Structures are given as structure tokens and as C-alpha cells.
């Protein structure tokens, strides 16, 4: 189990994580959503022990994570950027094998062949999507007990996305893998996660289970220009403004959302994935 209690972090004088609480159950998949600047990446860097909190506690298997080598060896972390790109996938694998006693060479070979990656080529010549696949091959070959992913399918084509999700779901079912996924795409998470947490201004504001997400949680973009509008009849989980356009995640039925917004004659109104 991953448990975060009262996590607090200040960076450059700004409160990034504000007494945050969350829990990820063993063998479950938890989706973490929130606007840019909400603190998703900072939270993840605490969960994997890269950053030390100013206050609060982070436990995995009831043990603190920071400077805990044994716990870190059980964590697989795939970030938005890959490191050590000046060497080949094969050379990276040798490093991972030395670092992780649970390294599975047979699985590594299966994965890079499945994703059709050349293990002898330098990773720096790979496209962004290929680098993501390379990271996935390496991390999944460590046979992690906890998998933490920051925008894991960004830049992947549809076939690669399906393969990534297949391996993750299979490991959850077969090995009781525990997964936390940070994503901006609500629809992408819909058929994958057991729960979703909405991170906003450094706090988990709302949590939902999968069935509830499918029927009551909707992401929209809307613009009314300079017109004053009233959205008090909608339960807005969070909102993000991009000029005159608002990005909203709303906890409500789609029919009520269409009625409340449609009655106010929006210039733009789209249901987003």
C-alpha cells in the first residue's frame, strides 16, 4: 500500500503540496489528474524518494520512502523524460540488472522485441515515443511491486498504447502490481483505473471510483467570451483557464451539463477526452 499523510512542500517560496492525503491500495490502479501546476510531478517525485518533504509522511509497505534503498528497489518509475540516452538500450539494461536484484532478462528481451526496438542503437536517436517504450521495457523488466508513471503514453501511437496498458493490466492481475498513473486524459484512464484523484492547488480535492467516473465525471472546454455566466448549478471539481477558454472537470450528469451550459449560449462547448 502507498499511503501519504499530511504531505507539505514549499519550493521557491510557493506551497506546492498543501497537507495532501491519499492512499493507493495494493493491487489497484490509481489515476492522478490535475491542471498544469497542480503539483502532480512534485508529488510523484516524493513518492519515488527523489524529493524530501518539508512535513508529513509517505509510506510504502508501512516504511518511509526517502533514502530507503530496499523500498526504492520495489518501485518502477517512468518519468516524462528518459535519462542516459547517450548509450544503448542494451547498455542501460546492464546497469538496471546491477541495480535491481529482481531483473528479468527474459522479459526484457520479450519487451524490446514486442515494441520492435533495436537494443544496440543509441537511445538518443530514438523518437520521443520510442524513448517512452524503451523506458517501459527497462522498468517493467525490473518486475516492480509498485509502478509510478508520469504521463506514460504521451507520444505513443495507438498500437504502443494498447501494448503498454496490456502489460500493466496483466501484471496487476498476475503479480498484484500496484500502480499510480499521472495523466491529463480522463477518457484514457476510464477503462484502466480503479480510482481517480483530482489534484488541485496541492491537495487531493476529490476521489472517484471507476463506475462513478464513467457516468458522472466529464471534462469539457467552454468559452462565453466576455459574457458573465453562472455555473453554480454544476459541481465543478476543478477548472483551468486558457485565455477566454475554460477547461472544466465536472461531477454531474452529461444531460445537466449540456442544459446548464447550453442555456447560456457558449461560443465554444466541447466534451474532451
Where would I find each of the regions flagged by the language model?
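Conserved structural motif at the start of ABC-family nucleotide-binding domains
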Residues: 2-4, 17
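The feature captures the beta-strand-to-loop junction immediately N-terminal to the Walker
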Residues: 30-35
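Conserved ABC transporter NBD signature motif
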Residues: 56-67, 71
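ABC transporter nucleotide-binding domain
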Residues: 165-252
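Helix-to-loop junction immediately C-terminal to a conserved catalytic motif
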Residues: 48
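Catalytic Walker B motif of ABC-type/P-loop ATPase nucleotide-binding domains
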Residues: 147-151
Amino acid at each position: 500500500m502507498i499511503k501519504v499523510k499530511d504531505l507539505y512542500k514549499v519550493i521557491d517560496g510557493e506551497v506546492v503540496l498543501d497537507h495532501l492525503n491519499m492512499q493507493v491500495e495494493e493491487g489497484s490502479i490509481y489515476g492522478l489528474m490535475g491542471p498544469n501546476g497542480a503539483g502532480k510531478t512534485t508529488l510523484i517525485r516524493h513518492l519515488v524518494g527523489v524529493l524530501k518533504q518539508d512535513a508529513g509522511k509517505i509510506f510504502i509497505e508501512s516504511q518511509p520512502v526517502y533514502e530507503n534503498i530496499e523500498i526504492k528497489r520495489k518501485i518502477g518509475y517512468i518519468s516524462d523524460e528518459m535519462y542516459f540516452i547517450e548509450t544503448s538500450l542494451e547498455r542501460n539494461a546492464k546497469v538496471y540488472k546491477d541495480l535491481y536484484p529482481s531483473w528479468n532478462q527474459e522479459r526484457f528481451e520479450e519487451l524490446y522485441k514486442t515494441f520492435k526496438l533495436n537494443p544496440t542503437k543509441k537511445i538518443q536517436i530514438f523518437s520521443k515515443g520510442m524513448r517512452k517504450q524503451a523506458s517501459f521495457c527497462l522498468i517493467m523488466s525490473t518486475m516492480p511491486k509498485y509502478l509510478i508513471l508520469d504521463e506514460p503514453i504521451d507520444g505513443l501511437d495507438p498500437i504502443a498504447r494498447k501494448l503498454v496498458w496490456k502489460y500493466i493490466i496483466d501484471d496487476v492481475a498476475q503479480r498484484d502490481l500496484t500502480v499510480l498513473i499521472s495523466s491529463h486524459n480522463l477518457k484514457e484512464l476510464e477503462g484502466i483505473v480503479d480510482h481517480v484523484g483530482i489534484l488541485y492547488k496541492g491537495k487531493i480535492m476529490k476521489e472517484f471510483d471507476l463506475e462513478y467516473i464513467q457516468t458522472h465525471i466529464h471534462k469539457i472546454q467552454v468559452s462565453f467570451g466576455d459574457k458573465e455566466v453562472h455555473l453554480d448549478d454544476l459541481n465543478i471539481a476543478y477548472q483551468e483557464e486558457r485565455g477566454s477558454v475554460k477547461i472544466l472537470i465536472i461531477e454531474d450528469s452529461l444531460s445537466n451539463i449540456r442544459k446548464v451550459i447550453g442555456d447560456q449560449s457558449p461560443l465554444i462547448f466541447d466534451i474532451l477526452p
